[in-house]
């Protein structure tokens, strides 16, 4: 069985990890980095770029470069958070036929799970390149405060990417797994995971206990805000720059899509620099132009200014911490460790606020970018049966219930209930002779159903005519380990029942997902073709260059007919390379043709080289001979005549 990989599908960056024995390996992508920007660019020639290559070209292609799409996943177009993003994003956010928020690139409508699938596919390929074998199964993380629709949409993204999602796991829980299994501290510990990522914020209170040699991770409570993260911090800087530039130059940059993309890049860079410096300079020449000529942007921002700009955003993270502590039934002083997850927690102001609330310094020995992917990989190892010493008890983040008489939200499963769980309750009809009931399923904490998120609805029909209050309809809520809800309703008198897996009254249908899988496979085949074509073009370019060089040096050694043939084949290949519509077969044929006719040129080159080598060897031999002769002469010259006298014998 292949390995189950762990993927942290982030708003800003994504990361993939695997377990090798009991050692974790965070895998570098093809660019050599351990995290990949969650950015997808759709190019004019249908090529799809993912990660750093997409980020690099974003300034010149802002309308077709999609980022922070996770903020839209599983959301309705009408939601106020989506409406807020419409005014901020350089790409188009549109309303799909089913009322969901989708995006648009090159005039094509794309569902957020379809876009996120491109990032997941890159993570899958990264793992496959490292392992040298196909990968088909994954554990994917989501913010703990994601609702049912968002979890389902994330699972859909995995399917589109060609992955069987074995488990959806909450990001803070994954980080706790990574922390708990890496540390030597023994005994029961209560930890708080403060997870402020690119687009979402979560806080979870988790108890780590040693139960008969098995490490048990029990989530006591979770809370958060799925529309608060580093992207919002960046936006505050962008708004500030726009305001200052307008004051100085009288030009409003907020209407200039190209300028906005450059501002986004500069804001992110400035924010990162201000985590380690007290001041940074934003310098963007030629940011725009008007009748008086080009305009340049030059602005200094101090850490104090940034902290003032985002103070309320940092403050917004504290209330969920208070609620989580209260829901867990613990006191702040009971928390043994505070773990920071997500790149935005590197900001000193955030760390200061966390310390102020929890009364202790957060741990610094957890990598905020990689901990979540590591935890997902550990959970993958548990699910594959290779690890038996870990038990994970997660919770549902929001209450679930149905709408009853008067529009009231009747809770079936309360928030922070350990999952998987099942709950059944009997309801009845509101009118005499009512033959059908509509079950409307909601998620949220408001007393009235209308104030909560409608997850889905279905009918139970064929109820025998009876006075109101007589029929007994049993409604069952069943949450699986992924936090995804299955609902059933059964008429106890007739035994008739109806069941649904909540996919929201929006979401993608199975047919749409299957089509997206086919499109993705077709794209993969198309990408392979484009890669092969690029390889052929590169080979052609190299041959043109080497042939021209050889002709310059050895062309005069060829007879006129041979030279003409080579020049004709050379021109034919050059023309094919200039023709953007030329396919691989055409270029390969021209390369082959030039290769054939250039053989004579090659022979001349080798003959010339051999002659040169032979000449060099001969010259070297002659020189050596001369050296020997000279040496002998020198030796003779150096002989000293001895004096001797003849001795005569008697």
Swiss-Prot record:
Lineage, broadest ranks: Bacteria, Pseudomonadati, Pseudomonadota, Betaproteobacteria, Burkholderiales
Molecular function terms, GO-annotated: ATP binding; ATP-dependent protein folding chaperone; unfolded protein binding
Residues recorded with modification Phosphothreonine: 200
Keyword field contains Transmembrane: no
Pfam families given in the database record: HSP70
Gene from which this protein is expressed: dnaK
InterPro entries, sorted: ATPase_NBD, Chaperone_DnaK, Heat_shock_70_CS, HSP70_C_sf, HSP70_peptide-bd_sf, Hsp_70_fam
Induction: By stress conditions e.g. heat shock.
PANTHER family registered for this protein in UniProt: HEAT SHOCK PROTEIN 70KDA
UniProt similarity note: Belongs to the heat shock protein 70 family.
Species the sequence originates in: Burkholderia ambifaria (strain MC40-6)
Protein name: Chaperone protein DnaK
Signal peptide: none
Region (Disordered) location: 611-637
Record bears the keyword Lipid metabolism: no
UniProt KW keywords: ATP-binding, Chaperone, Nucleotide-binding, Phosphoprotein, Stress response
Compositional bias annotation for Low complexity: 611-636
Function: Acts as a chaperone.
């Amino acid at each position: 069985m292949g390995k189950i990989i762990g993927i942290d599908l982030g708003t800003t960056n994504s990361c993939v990890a695997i377990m090798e024995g009991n050692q974790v390996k965070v895998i570098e992508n093809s660019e050599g980095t351990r995290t990949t920007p969650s950015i997808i660019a759709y190019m004019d020639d249908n090529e799809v770029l993912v990660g750093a290559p997409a980020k690099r070209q974003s300034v010149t292609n802002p309308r077709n470069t999609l980022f922070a799409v996770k903020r839209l996943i599983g959301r309705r177009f009408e939601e106020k958070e989506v409406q807020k993003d419409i005014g901020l994003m350089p790409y188009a956010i549109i309303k799909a036929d089913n009322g969901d928020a989708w995006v648009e690139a090159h005039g094509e409508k794309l569902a957020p799970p379809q876009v996120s699938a491109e990032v997941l596919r890159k993570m899958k390929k990264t793992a496959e390149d490292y392992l040298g074998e196909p990968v088909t199964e994954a554990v994917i993380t989501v913010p703990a405060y994601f609702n049912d629709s968002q979890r389902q949409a994330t699972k859909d993204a995995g399917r589109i990417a060609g992955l069987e999602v074995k488990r959806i796991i909450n990001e803070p829980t994954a980080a706790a797994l990574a922390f708990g299994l890496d540390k030597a501290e023994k005994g029961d510990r209560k930890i708080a995971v403060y997870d402020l990522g690119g687009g979402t914020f979560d806080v979870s209170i988790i108890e780590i206990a040693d139960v008969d040699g098995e490490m048990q991770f029990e989530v006591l409570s979770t809370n958060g805000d799925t529309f608060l993260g580093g992207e919002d911090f960046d936006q505050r800087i962008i708004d500030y720059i726009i305001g200052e530039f307008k004051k100085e130059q009288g030009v409003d940059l907020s209407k200039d899509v190209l300028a906005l993309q450059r501002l986004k890049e500069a804001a992110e860079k400035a924010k990162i620099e201000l985590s380690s410096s007290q001041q940074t300079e934003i310098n963007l020449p030629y940011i725009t132009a008007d009748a008086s000529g080009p305009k340049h942007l030059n602005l200094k921002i101090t850490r104090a200014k940034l902290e003032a700009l985002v103070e309320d955003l940092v403050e917004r993270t504290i209330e969920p911490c208070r609620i989580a502590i209260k829901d867990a039934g613990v006191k702040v002083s009971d928390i043994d460790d505070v773990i920071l997850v997500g790149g935005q927690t590197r900001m000193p102001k955030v760390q200061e606020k966390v310390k102020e609330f929890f009364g202790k310094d957060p741990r610094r020995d957890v990598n905020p970018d990689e901990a979540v992917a590591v935890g997902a990989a550990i959970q993958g190892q548990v699910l594959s049966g290779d690890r038996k010493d870990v038990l994970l008890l997660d919770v549902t983040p929001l209450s679930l219930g149905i709408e009853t008489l008067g529009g009231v939200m009747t809770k079936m499963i309360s928030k922070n209930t350990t999952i998987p769980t099942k709950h059944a309750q009997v309801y009845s009809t509101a009118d005499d002779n009512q033959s059908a009931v509509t079950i409307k399923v909601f998620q949220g904490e408001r007393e009235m159903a209308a104030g909560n998120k409608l997850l889905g609805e279905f009918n139970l029909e064929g109820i025998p005519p009876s006075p109101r209050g007589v029929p007994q309809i049993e409604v069952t809520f069943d949450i699986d380990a992924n936090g995804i809800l299955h609902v059933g309703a059964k008429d106890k008198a007739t035994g008739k029942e109806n069941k649904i897996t909540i996919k929201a009254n929006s979401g993608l249908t199975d047919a749409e997902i299957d089509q997206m899988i086919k499109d993705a496979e077709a794209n993969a085949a198309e990408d392979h073709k484009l890669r092969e074509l690029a390889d052929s073009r590169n080979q052609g370019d190299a041959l043109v260059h080497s042939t021209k060089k050889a002709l310059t040096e050895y062309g005069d050694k060829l007879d006129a007919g041979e030279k003409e043939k080579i020049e004709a084949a050379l021109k034919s290949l050059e023309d094919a390379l200039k023709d953007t519509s030329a396919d691989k077969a055409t270029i390969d044929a021209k390369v082959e043709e030039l290769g054939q006719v250039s053989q004579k040129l090659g022979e001349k080159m080798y003959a010339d080289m051999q002659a040169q080598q032979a000449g060099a060897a001969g010259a070297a031999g002659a020189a050596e001979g001369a050296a020997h002769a000279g040496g002998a002469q020198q030796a003779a010259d150096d002989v000293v005549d001895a004096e001797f006298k003849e001795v005569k014998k008697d």
